[in-house]
Amino acid sequence: MSQMERLLERLDYIQEQILTLYEKDSVDLEDHIRLWNLLRRENAIWYVLRQEGHARVGGRAVPAMTVSEANAKFAIEMQIKLESLKASPYAAEGWSLQETTKERYLAEPSRTFKKLGQPVTLMFDNDPENLTEVVLWKWVYYITPTDEWYKARGGIDDTGIYYIDHESVKMYYVRFDMEAENFSETGTVTYRLGSALVNVPEPVTVTDSSSTRERTPKVLRPQGSRRRRNEETGEPVAPAPKRRRGAYGRRSSPKAQRRTAASPVSRGNGGSSDFTSGESDEGHRVRHRALRKKTAGVAPAEGHYLVGAKGPVNSLRCLRYKWKNKYSGDIMYLGTTFTWTESDGTERCGSGRFFCAFSNETKREKFLKSVKIPKNIGLFRAHAEKL
């Protein structure tokens, strides 16, 4: 038996075991650890096959070496994290396959395990078509640098969506000021919690995270076909994400004007503008209905028109590769994938990003109308005077 035959035989066996575990739908961490171990081995075989020059085997396309390598490394990370979680007090809770997926793990707050997500729909400028959806997780499981696991409860307030860490500090992973900065013209933000609408004190402005104010929100309840504002005292509850529309060219604070790109994301045309609720399968699933519409305001007269992409780094690399091959005639420059870091350290913040530049707004809008966006990737407009 040749080496090629042995590899293919091994690959078939591994893929059969992977399918068996998917069908088992176990809640045992040991099964999920085994699954990620199999995924690592599968990608190792794909890597070797591509290294030996095989583009297709048995009618199947062989992934690029960089893709297989990245997938294998991520599988190792997941296996190590799950083995550590299995040794923690939270192993006995029971973990579904969905709760240990790559999408759930990378959803904000990134590289944590999360349970019981609820959708929180944000509405900007009191416009029922200017919506986005984010996720509030009831429970967030994270590990410290000293390898200690903690279970944190999620919550929501006037500042944004957060979880409370083991030192009783609110760790925000969605900030309403940042959302409004990119998708609102007036700074008005309203979000739905169950059957009530909560009006964030307006206008929302960019503030330092250390100066968070605790306030009781105003609760808005719909009456008839129109939503009327009734002031009540209510304690926010946990939710998660949905759909949004952005505004371009709005006035922002000097601090906001210094930013080169926005953090919110979008994908494709949104569906119904009605508020809905329910557990989200993936964190930060966002549809940005107005991204493909030309919004009000004064567009920049000079410089470069940008489209930014945000999401899991591996998915971004695949998307960037596709754009490079398919839209090279439209895109002027295509940046590499990167992540933001804290200004006073090296800790990564949020998901990966990359930008592509267009010579004029017409080409950018044409691109946005034609491009297909994966479910776990979001897009946003940006502008730069120089590149």
From Swiss-Prot:
Subcellular location: Host nucleus
Region entry Disordered, spans: 204-295
Region of interest (DNA-binding domain), residue spans: 303-387
Cross-link Glycyl lysine isopeptide (Lys-Gly) (interchain with G-Cter in SUMO) residue location(s): K310
Pfam families linked to this entry: PPV_E2_C, PPV_E2_N
Keyword Phosphoprotein applies: yes
GO CC aspect terms: host cell nucleus
Quaternary structure, from the entry: Binds DNA as homodimer. Interacts with protein E1; this interaction greatly increases E1 DNA-binding activity. Interacts with protein L1; this interaction enhances E2-dependent replication and transcription activation. Interacts with protein L2; this interaction inhibits E2 transcriptional activity but not DNA replication function E2. Interacts with protein E7; this interaction inhibits E7 oncogenic activity. Interacts with host TAF1; this interaction modulates E2-dependent transcriptional regulation. Interacts with host BRD4; this interaction mediates E2 transcriptional activation function.
Protein name: Regulatory protein E2
